[in-house]
Amino acid sequence: PLAKKHNVKILPADSEHSAIFQCIQGLPEGALRRIILTASGGAFRDLPVEKLKEVKVADALKHPNWNMGKKITVDSATLFNKGLEVIEAHYLFGAEYDDIEIVIHPQSIIHSMVETQDSSVLAQLGWPDMRLPILYTLSWPERVYCSEITWPRLDLCNVDLTFKKPDHVKYPSMDLAYAAGRAGGTMTGVLSAANEKAVEMFIDEKISYLD
C-alpha cells in the first residue's frame, strides 16, 4: 500500500523473487496463474528423515550450492527460508497462497518459475550467485553486460535440471509458513521471530536440530 501511495516500484533482490519479477515482465494483467518457487533442499536434502536427530551445527552449515551466512544456511536446511519466500511472493506479486508452490531443484539453476493462464511456464536460469539478481535490481530496467571474467556463462549442455516434491515430514516449516500467511495479522512476524530464536539457540548448541 505504501509503494502504491507514493507511486514507486519495489524491486526484489532475492534470487527467487527477482526470477519471478523477470518472468512477469510484459505479461498482461491477470495472466499469472501460479508461482513456482525452487528450493535447493539445503544441507539435508539427501539425508533420511530418521537421521536428522543426529545432525550437528557444522552439518547444517554445509550448503551444497550457495555460500551464505549461518542463519540463512540453517534456514535453507529447514526450508524455513522458502516458507518466508512464499509469504513474500504473496505480498510482492498478489498471488494467493494456493497458487504458490515449492519444488526441490537440487542444482539451483532455475531460480523460480511462473505459470500463465494458458499453462505456459516461464523460468529464469543462472548460476547460484547472488551477484546476478542484485545486479539486475540495481540496473533495472537495463541489462548490464558481464564478461566471462566476471562469472562463467551458463552451459545448458553441462548441467542437470531435476525436480522433486518437498518432503513435508522433513520440512515441516513449510506448512507453518503457509498457515501463518493465511492467518495474517501478526502471525508471520511471530513465526519469523520464533524461528530467529530457534536458529540462534541451535547455532549456539543450546538445542538440537529437531527441537
Swiss-Prot record:
Iron-sulfur recorded as keyword: no
| One GO process term, biological-process aspect | isopentenyl diphosphate biosynthetic process, methylerythritol 4-phosphate pathway involved in terpenoid biosynthetic process
Summarize induction of expression.
Induced by jasmonic acid (MeJA), salicylic acid (SA) and UV-C irradiation.
InterPro entries named among the record's database cross-references:
DXP_reductoisomerase, DXP_reductoisomerase_C, DXPR_C, DXPR_C_sf
The pathway entry for this protein reads as:
Isoprenoid biosynthesis; isopentenyl diphosphate biosynthesis via DXP pathway; isopentenyl diphosphate from 1-deoxy-D-xylulose 5-phosphate: step 1/6
Cellular compartment(s): Plastid, Chloroplast stroma
Expressing tissues: Mostly expressed in flowers and, to a lower extent, in leaves.
The entry's keywords: Chloroplast, Isomerase, Metal-binding, Oxidoreductase, Plastid
Q: Which gene encodes it?
A: DXR
Q: Which domain of life is it from?
A: Eukaryota
Catalysed reaction(s) here are: 2-C-methyl-D-erythritol 4-phosphate + NADP(+) = 1-deoxy-D-xylulose 5-phosphate + NADPH + H(+)
Report what the protein is called: 1-deoxy-D-xylulose 5-phosphate reductoisomerase
Q: What is its EC number?
A: 1.1.1.267
User: Which Pfam families does the record match to this protein?
Assistant: DXP_redisom_C, DXPR_C
Q: Where does Mn(2+) bind?
A: D14, E16, E85
* Main subcellular location: plastid
Question: What is a GO molecular function of this protein?
Answer: isomerase activity
Q: What is the role of the protein in this entry?
A: Enzyme of the plastid non-mevalonate pathway for isoprenoid biosynthesis that catalyzes the NADPH-dependent rearrangement and reduction of 1-deoxy-D-xylulose-5-phosphate (DXP) to 2-C-methyl-D-erythritol 4-phosphate (MEP). Required for chloroplast development.
What is one term from the GO cellular component aspect held by the record?
chloroplast stroma
Oxidoreductase: present as a keyword of the record? yes
Gene3D superfamilies attached here?
A: 1.10.1740.10
